[in-house]
């Protein structure tokens, strides 16, 4: 309508009418494309909203557009191989890592305990037991200690009572009370030393019904490799035993499971070397990570850490990653490059529709989408791909628009998300670069440097391309 009105106001000659008609036909084609997508969706699903679309239960089946990576992950999980995932943010690397943990064979998980070492207190002994047995062992030791404590308390009261009675009969009550106090504190010291023999559970796998999954992204050395807590009281019998201060790291908690590390190149080289050592020897001792701590004097026996490593990052990760660690992954696993887009065919459009249903179900707070709204999301995926006849696979950002549209619908009190909500959400979920570019354009409009509506003979505007995730190029 704006084009037709501009044509009348400008009195565009007949020679220029064809150009206006072509532009108008292109606008009509875009609308027809949305209708075409909607009809395709209706042919896939005999539904009216995404609420009726079935979402797969298995996490690996919820991965969208990464067919090659899914096949590699299935093979790696079956054979317990390491995997290095390289790709842009939001393409499903973390989801693949979590899905792989569900696919790992259910081996006999083990609990890990730390025992005191009478020969060398600063080298606690490490023992493994079947899953769920560690707590039983601790309960047995506590019950035994409690029984011994009750017996000693009875003996203590008997001895103190006997001393007081004898002191009264001999007329030496003051000396009797003094002796009773000495015996009382002596028994307390013996009780403290006796409690040292109770072991500590380092890894408790009783809560896992499948292979453990640990996300070590951004973890510091102590959390990843284990640590020994500082003890301010190191003498006089008041210090905490070394084995009770030992804390297991993620590489130990992931024993017979999976350790996922995103942006692995951000880890220090020393930490990458330690991870490599743990992968090679399938065991790694725990020691204090701070040289200023008393825990630095403690170094346990080797703690089992037979884990599968799934590392992720971008292309720069390959440059900063420890060469030996990458070689270990390649030698005992796979390297996978994540796709950024997929062809806009019927099968992949169906996947985007299922993705919308998955996001709504996962969020559990936003309403479901109408078919017209889903068709608009498909068109948004086409626009964000920055590639002809393709759909984007940066689904985290696309999911952000889905949630934003749901929030708009909720704010208006609507039970179904429509195209109108998506149009409003597109404005709300713009990137910072997009917002800055729009602000710049509005400022320039005030000075009439260029026009953005209508048609005018003899005036030419510069071409500005607004790419997804960037400003004006």
Regions found by a protein language model. Name each.
Residues 6-11:
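Short Lys/Arg-rich cationic patches that frequently serve as NLS/NoLS or arginine-rich RNA/DNA-binding motifs
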């Amino acid at each position: 309508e704006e084009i037709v009105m501009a044509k009348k106001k400008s009195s565009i000659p007949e020679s220029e009418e064809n150009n206006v008609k072509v532009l108008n036909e292109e606008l009509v084609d875009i609308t027809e494309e949305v209708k075409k997508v909607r009809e395709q969706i209706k042919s896939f699903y005999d539904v009216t909203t995404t609420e009726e679309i079935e979402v797969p239960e298995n996490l690996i089946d919820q991965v969208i557009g990464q067919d090659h990576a899914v096949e590699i992950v299935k093979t790696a999980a079956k054979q317990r191989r390491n995997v290095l995932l390289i790709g842009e943010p939001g393409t499903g690397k973390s989801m693949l890592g979590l899905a792989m943990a569900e696919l790992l064979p259910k081996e006999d998980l083990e609990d890990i305990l730390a025992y005191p070492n009478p020969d060398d207190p600063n080298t606690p002994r490490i023992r493994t037991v079947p899953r769920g047995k560690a707590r039983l062992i601790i309960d047995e030791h506590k019950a035994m200690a409690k029984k011994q404590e009750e017996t000693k308390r009875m003996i203590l009261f008997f001895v103190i009572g006997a001393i007081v009675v004898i002191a009264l009969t001999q007329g030496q009550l003051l000396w009797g009370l003094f002796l009773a106090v000495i015996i009382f504190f002596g028994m307390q010291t013996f009780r403290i030393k006796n409690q040292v023999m109770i072991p500590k559970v380092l890894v408790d796998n009783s809560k896992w019904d499948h292979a453990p999954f640990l996300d070590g992204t951004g973890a510091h050395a102590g959390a990843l490799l284990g640590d020994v807590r500082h003890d301010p009281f190191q003498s006089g019998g008041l210090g905490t035993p070394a084995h009770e201060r030992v804390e297991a790291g993620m590489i130990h908690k992931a024993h017979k499971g999976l350790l996922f590390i995103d942006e692995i190149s951000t880890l220090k080289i020393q930490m990458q070397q330690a991870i490599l050592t743990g992968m090679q020897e399938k065991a790694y001792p725990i020691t204090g990570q701070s040289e200023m701590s008393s825990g630095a004097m403690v170094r346990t026996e080797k703690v089992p850490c037979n884990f599968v490593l799934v590392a992720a990052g971008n292309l720069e990760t390959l440059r900063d990653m420890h060469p030996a660690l990458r070689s270990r992954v390649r030698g005992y696993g796979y390297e996978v490059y994540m796709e950024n887009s997929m062809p806009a065919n019927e099968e992949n459009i169906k996947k985007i529709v299922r993705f919308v249903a998955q996001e709504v179900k996962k969020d559990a707070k936003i309403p479901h989408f109408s078919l017209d709204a889903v068709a608009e999301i498909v068109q948004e995926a086409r626009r964000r791909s920055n590639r002809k006849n393709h759909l984007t696979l940066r689904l985290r950002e696309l999911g952000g628009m889905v949630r934003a549209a749901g929030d708009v619908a909720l704010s208006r009190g609507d039970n179904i998300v429509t195209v109108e909500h998506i149009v409003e959400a597109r404005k709300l979920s713009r990137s910072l670069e997009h917002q800055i570019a729009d602000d710049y354009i509005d400022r320039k409009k005030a000075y009439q440097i260029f026009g953005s509506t209508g048609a005018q003979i003899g005036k030419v505007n510069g071409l500005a391309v607004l790419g997804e995730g960037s400003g004006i190029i």
